[in-house]
Amino acid sequence: AYLKEKGLVKNSTSYYMRIWRSVYNLAVEQGYTTDKKPFKHVYTGIDKTVKRAVPFKIIKMIKELDLSFEPQLELARDIFLFSFYTRGMSFIDMAHLKKSNLQNGILTYSRKKTGQRLTILWEELMQEIVDKYKDDSSEYLLPILRYCDINDRKQYKLRAKQIGRGLNKIGLRLELKAPLTFYVARHSWASIAQDRKVSTDIIREGLGHDNEKTTHIYLASISTSQIDRANQIILKGL
């Protein structure tokens, strides 16, 4: 109930329940408690996620929108595109990217959700966005958070709301069937990868998924160089 009140979807709450179940089972195994089966009626499965992907032509339309007189919408659009360019990077991970995460043409970061470390070959499309919002006084790579360790949570929540509102307006303007969110960027990257004959294994690694089942949920509703090559194939034409 607590996680639901915080806005987490069923699959996310299930993910945390599976972690707690593992910890509890370990405690039982080591004799710290008896097995009272507290998770007997707790949902720990995975629901089939509704596909949110849009085709490549819609991504291109979003990129080509003239939003020069609407800076809030322009920022929202650019952060959405950066997510797509970086294989569906989540908003929280983008918000906390620092300039130090980019070294020698490689962007390296750890997913907040799983702790998994991912590397992405830096592309010109990504650099265009960074250059557009360049701020020498900030340690952050993107213009989401401005100041390190000063009301970080407050800054994050405010920017998430502003950018989310901007994406919603863009989606309405383009008359999309579903709300435009960062899930759309992630699902679209996976779907377009599949359309361009990228293997499921490479898509899975690119998304940072732990198992192939999760990847198939995205698609159906290796080496770093292979993933980077796949991303170049997906971004071609933008």
Language-model regions, residue ranges each:
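Catalytic-site neighborhood detector that most strongly recognizes the C-terminal catalytic loop/helix
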Residues: 53, 111-115, 207-232
